[in-house]
């Protein structure tokens, strides 16, 4: 198999002058934006249907997915779907029998304010009567002193006035104590409550009772006045949203489970050192719908009973990260841009050409052929950055060049780090792009999600330290998957090399990988470096590569093909080897595509044919490998 038959220059995916967006418009001003939040959710049709069903049947929902895929938006949308006619106000009353157990009462929305106002008015009326009584006592004493101006009359008068003031003051305090406190006020709400309890501590989530430093002498604050509702109570008849629910302690998750089961939860002081710990109200209604969110790790860290409750009385939904690249879905991205402009309120609308560039970026970030990304928060960041640039330039609309400039200016931290990494390593010749080196290869890796780096890897062969067998020794802060991938490489080497490998120790070093390496996409790079060191054949340094490797010698697909290739371009590398399966995942702009030659491969021998320098040793090596690999029918 010659190099010309292996080499295939990829055709960029629709990176032309125009893109079919499925709708005719000049600017996003013409695009209608739905009023309901549920209609603004893009690409998560399955999740939308579940949310609608859950809202109708009052079921709990667990949303699992990556950040920026619309989990919190779905929670807010659910609150819009809930009815408002069932909303209630919650009041706390003093308990004359036990002041440390205030009474709880629920009334229809808006009646709570009227009840509190009535109690306050009665208290003020009684206050007026007491003032009149005090004035009458003072007037009577003054009259008595005038009629009989003796020392005894004066002293008795002063005593009567002071005693009257003390009695009336105590009566005033008691009347004030009888006024209830409005814990939850839903008056005037046009939609059901939506409470975001992400990261809340115990007092904020479950309710608390404030500490009272004055607990004697009539100076203390009544217990019911110190009761504060928790977020579970504020979400009564609405939605309680908790992102990264696994960050809650197991004790809080257990309390949350109790509240979900009983639909009511008493409020008590959360601190043992506070006087509020002595107060415990009657159970306070908290009939909420829980919308919990998190990533896949969340499932392992959740309280088993809490997850069982959600699964048994609700739904679990996995949020998609991509959607098919269809005309209908492109139309949805146009709507998304219009929504972001309207939601921001400070940036101008986008021209059609600018929206096309956003859609192209969505194609690129999907990382899969025929798909668009659904990590819309990141795309929204580009929309806002482009709008800021257009405002700075004094433009009426955001144009294509503003979007391109925004993508350069608003690079994520990982991309800035990757650019610095490549520049720094090239300056000190850690990354080489010319000539040939034995046992040295330019691998490719990804930092974060969309930032590629060049990863130099070196291998040397030394006589085995053990008489029994040789070892593969790897350094460079590798993760578990990366270590296992290196072990898989040894299977191919043993197969073509035979027993001779037992006489050697093979050392593999990932150069200056202080950030660590994880994943198996460096497998073909390690295999190439080791084989080069064993056979003493130089590797071309103008070639970079990425790909996973099976023990049968097949090159398997990897993630992040496009950012890896872009990193190679920025490093000055001329050729890149990628898995054949990732061929259509590559999405490069025309100016970048012309700077690189891309070689899709299916087997390790195709990798070596491109990466190793020509010579009779290379031809003999390829012959032996093809004879040894089971892919070519060898036993």
UniProtKB/Swiss-Prot annotation:
Which UniProt keywords are listed? ATP-binding, Cell membrane, Hydrolase, Magnesium, Membrane, Nucleotide-binding, Protease, Serine protease, Transmembrane, Transmembrane helix
Query: What is the recorded function of this protein according to its Swiss-Prot or TrEMBL entry?
Result: Serine protease that displays ATP-independent proteolytic activity towards peptides and unfolded proteins and ATP-dependent activity for the cleavage of folded proteins.
Q: What is its EC number?
A: 3.4.21.-
Domain Lon proteolytic, residue spans: 435-614
Describe its assembly. Homohexamer. Organized in a ring with a central cavity.
Q: What is this protein called?
A: Archaeal Lon protease
Give the activity regulation note. ADP inhibits the peptide cleavage activity of LonTk, but the enzyme retains 57% activity in comparison to the condition with the addition of ATP.
What's the domain of life for this entry?
Answer: Archaea
Q: Which residues lie on this side of the membrane: Cytoplasmic?
A: 1-131, 174-635
Q: How does activity depend on temperature?
A: Optimum temperature is 70 degrees Celsius for the ATP-independent peptide cleavage activity, and 95 degrees Celsius for ATPase activity.
* Binding, ATP: 65-72
Q: In terms of one coarse class, where is the protein primarily found?
A: membrane
The active site of this protein is located at 521 (nucleophile), 564
Q: Name one GO molecular function term.
A: ATP binding
Location of this chain's protein in the cell: Cell membrane
Q: How does it sit in the membrane?
A: Multi-pass membrane protein
